[in-house]
Amino acid sequence: MALSFKNSSGSIKAKRIKDGLVNANDIETTVIDFSYEKPDLSSVDGFSLKSLLSSDGWHIVVAYQCVTNSEQLNNNKKNNKTQKFRLFTFDIIVIPGLKPNKSKNVVSYNRFMALCIGMICYHKKWKVFNWTRKSYEDNTSTIDFNEDEDFMNKLAMSAGFSKEHKYHWFYSTGFEYTFDIFPAEVIAMSLFRWSHRVELKIKYTHESDLVEPMVRQLTKKGTISDVMDIIGKSTIAKRYEEIVKDRSSTGIGTKYNDVLDEFKEIIKKINSSSLDSTIKDCLKDIEE
């Protein structure tokens, strides 16, 4: 049975779908000029992060590589390139601007990154939320893998999350789509991005833009107040404390203040006769 995948530019057609999987050979993973075709059952969403993470044959190294090279992958997305990655025994096909569809392995870029985040956090032994029991529990991953020292999340590093920080691999594009398994973490990280938006130089039109992706995932589970109660506000607060703990403030504002403090100490050591009018004017506001 043929299947069309709708994205912002039109649609991409695959020859067949079997057991929810599309064969990567049926879709050319390169830049494509899309022509519009009416998608089949585009309103049906077959994506399930939890289901994919229960798949066999993990290629965890690919997840680490993708987050490490996320800047290049994001540029490919911006250039409208379709990409494929062997995360499991089957390929994950990434189509820019993809709309929900009934395939579980043809996904948008943000959902793909969420899948990489989920795999890495499973590997790091993060607890997973059970919506039926309304509590966190151990994940079932038993994969044994030692990550390469060259692997790192550059975006997280720029936000002050060192490689040793628990949230180093979580702070990445698409983290909101891990809500099904890490709801408290997603809410807490969204709160962190909002409260540190100036330091992180996050571009936005309205403050609501900073939490909108999280809210979209949250409301799939129920009303905001009900879902917050299910997860537990105290649990969310603890996750926020984990996020800000031991984080290096790398924002330019903090660096600026640090430099000014150093300047003040240097000024004290300079002979007053060497402080010409120009430097005095520059340092006047600092001294005040």
From Swiss-Prot:
Location of the protein in the cell: Virion
Superkingdom per UniProt: Viruses
Q: Which residues carry this modification: N-acetylalanine?
A: 2
Q: Does the keyword RNA-binding apply?
A: no
- In which broad location class does this protein mainly occur, judging by the first location in its UniProt entry? virion
GO CC terms: viral capsid
Keyword list (alphabetical) reads: Acetylation, Capsid protein, Virion
Family membership: Belongs to the high plain virus capsid family.
The identity of this protein, by name, is Capsid protein
User: Taxonomic classification, please?
Assistant: Viruses, Riboviria, dsRNA viruses, High Plains virus
